[in-house]
From Swiss-Prot:
The modification N-acetylmethionine is found at M1. Signal peptide: none annotated. The gene is Pnp. This is Purine nucleoside phosphorylase. Coiled coil: none annotated. Homotrimer. It is an enzyme of class 2 (transferase). It comes from Rattus norvegicus. The lineage of its organism: Eukaryota, Metazoa, Chordata, Craniata, Vertebrata.
Length: 289
């Protein structure tokens, strides 16, 4: 499906937000399933329910509160999505990624994407954090790309490169932040693969995804990253490993959304500290609003 939004639609939403808040964010953070507690770390917070904001879709999944929260985190002006949108909710990719282009028009230059993911890499354990080094856009192989349709040069070029989608310098700074935290558990790094959902993977599918080189699998993130890079935003992402993907027919365990939420809750404090420290390493704003 081609983009149902015009440039003016994005502008109207950005102008509505500008007129309702004095915050001028530099960093946008998309909070994944069960990770919305990051917003509690913001100072001078100001929140809007998605249903207040023109053109914004609505979150329908447990663990996604459906609020846009502005504030400051470690000296950086931020806007956080307390809940994202997914293909499996029935949303087009232009709706899934709508907020990212609005953030760009608000002056955001850095996007931090977080998600809950299943671990495909046998070395990963539940509770691990994996920095996203690269991604595999599985829906993209079937023509589901958020940039499909006429290109708007005001956002970016027709054929954007994705070989450097995740900022290398930010990943290195993330490793430094992890050391600063004194965590005993190793900080992981790997490739995230997106499936459309809402079903979890079969054993055969899981084995195939691992053969493709994926370390973690989830149902989000990639469309937002593609649109962010199209707009020229710096992108940093990480996955919280909330379950180990079943890759053996003799394994009777089953993935569930409840365990995803519980793993997010258990790791909340660690994640909040990690993102907070990481904010210090984001370069100052390069362009004025």
């Amino acid at each position: 499906m081609e983009n149902e939004f015009t440039y003016e639609d994005y502008q109207r939403t950005a102008e509505w937000l500008r007129s309702h808040t004095k915050h001028r964010p530099q960093v946008a953070v998309i909070c994944g399933s069960g990770l919305g507690g990051l917003t509690a770390k913001l100072t001078q917070p100001q929140a809007f329910d998605y249903n207040e904001i023109p053109n914004f879709p609505q979150s329908t999944v447990q663990g996604h509160a459906g609020r846009l929260v502005f504030g400051f985190l470690n000296g950086r002006s931020c806007v956080m999505m307390q809940g994202r949108f997914h293909m499996y909710e029935g949303y087009s990719l232009s709706k899934v990624t709508f907020p990212v282009r609005v953030f760009h028009l608000l002056g955001v230059d850095t996007l931090v994407v977080t998600n809950a993911a299943g671990g495909l890499n046998p070395k990963f354990e539940v509770g691990d954090i994996m920095l996203i080094r690269d991604h595999i856009n599985l829906p993209g192989f079937c023509g589901q790309n958020p940039l499909r349709g006429p290109n708007d040069e005001r956002f970016g070029v027709r054929f954007p490169a994705m070989s450097d989608a995740y900022d290398r310098d930010m990943r290195q700074k993330a490793f430094n932040a992890w050391k600063q935290m004194g965590e005993q558990r190793e900080l992981q790094e790997g490739t995230y693969i997106m499936s459309a959902g809402p079903t979890f993977e079969t054993v055969a599918e899981s084995c195939l995804l691992r053969m493709l080189g994926a370390d973690a699998v989830g149902m989000s993130t990639v469309p937002e990253v593609i649109v962010a890079r199209h707009c020229g935003l710096r992108v940093f992402g990480f996955s919280l490993i909330t379950n180990k993907v079943v890759m053996d027919y003799n394994n009777l365990e089953k993935a569930s959304h409840q365990e995803v939420l519980e793993a997010g809750k258990a790791a909340a404090q660690k994640l909040e500290q990690f993102v907070s420290i990481l904010m210090e390493s984001i370069p100052p704003r390069e362009r004025a609003n």
